[in-house]
Amino acid sequence: MEPVKAPAPLVIISSSPYIHCGSTISAAMRDVLLSLLPALAAAVYFFGWSALSVILTCCLSAVICEALCQKLMQRPITVGDGSALLTGLLLAFCLPPELSLGLAAFGSFCAVVIGKQVFGGLGSNIFNPAHLGRAILLASFPAQMTTWTMPWNTAAAEAVTKTTPYTDAVSSATPLAALRLAESAWQRGLNVDLPSLSALFWGNVGGSLGETCVPALLLGGIYLLWRGHIDWRIPAGYIGTVVVITAIYGWLREYPTWFAIYHLLSGGLIIGAFFMATDWVTSPITKKGRLIYALGLGILTALIRLRGGYVEGVCYSILIMNMVTPLIDRYVTNVPFGGGARHE
């Protein structure tokens, strides 16, 4: 007697999502990489070939570290999707232009292995990998991570060295550091020359190699908004909160009227708001949650910049709010159609 064969299933059961836009990880990563090309060109233009060597080292190290880590963990090797390349590029944009290539490679290792693969790979990490790599570098090598190179045009350097001794100009002549020194001078009734707002806007100032040129970053951010890869609520809420808090702080202390604009154009606020805080994995999933997340980012960044011991607060504020994201997603959720309020 022949065995009875079971009929073919008429219904295939699978998990959601059942309908999607057709976009893939590789396509999304290509769009983000494309949006960063203007900032990359600006970095090489202002800081020269040393900036390009740091960028190439970070990108190559990130790809190699991810491939080796996935091989050792017996996971599918996914370096072709571009996520490791993007992590390396974003990390490079947060580093000083003259950082040694060995430290750049170490930062990529920390970003990819500790920041992503240890948690299970892409989609499972709780921290932004690039900023985690930067934070580890800053904690481990503070002197090297706070040594800045002026752009090829010395006009901005001359403006900053008027506020600091010449021998300290390289290590402390970022706009935010100069602004912190200027605050002390203003409280004593002294006037201080700072880099102009136009120099801040165009990027002809000292700083991390990918954060100084505002037009290039805005161009990339607008492209991501147009392509639908990021939600406007995060960059708008983040930047708006920082501007409001610094404006009120400057008004209460009778600082110049452009004090808040200086904070807007200085440091890593623009790149952080458009490219770091909007990371799909580490940011909230709901619209209301993203607004709360952006508000928290702005408050933390402003507090660290205005009252903290370190003049820049973007990196740490994003890492802190990354930890808060699961809590936001837990209590700020969309109610399914037909469902009622959640009771616990």
Please describe what each predicted stretch is.
Residues 1-66, 70, 341-344:
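N-terminal signal-anchor module of multipass membrane proteins
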Residues 31-39, 54-66, 83-88, 92, ...:
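Alpha-helical transmembrane segments in multi-pass membrane proteins
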Residues 48-61, 98-107, 200-214, 257-269:
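Structural signature of hydrophobic alpha-helical transmembrane segments
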Residues 64-76, 112-123, 219-227, 274-283:
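C-terminal ends of transmembrane helices
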Residues 84, 89-162:
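Membrane-interface helix-loop-helix junctions at boundaries between adjacent transmembrane segments
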Residues 126-131, 260-267, 290, 308-321:
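Loop-to-transmembrane alpha-helix initiation sites
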Residues 129-217:
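Long hydrophobic alpha-helical segments that form multi-pass transmembrane helix bundles
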Residues 235-238, 244-287:
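A beta-strand-loop signature enriched in Asp, Gly, Thr, and Trp
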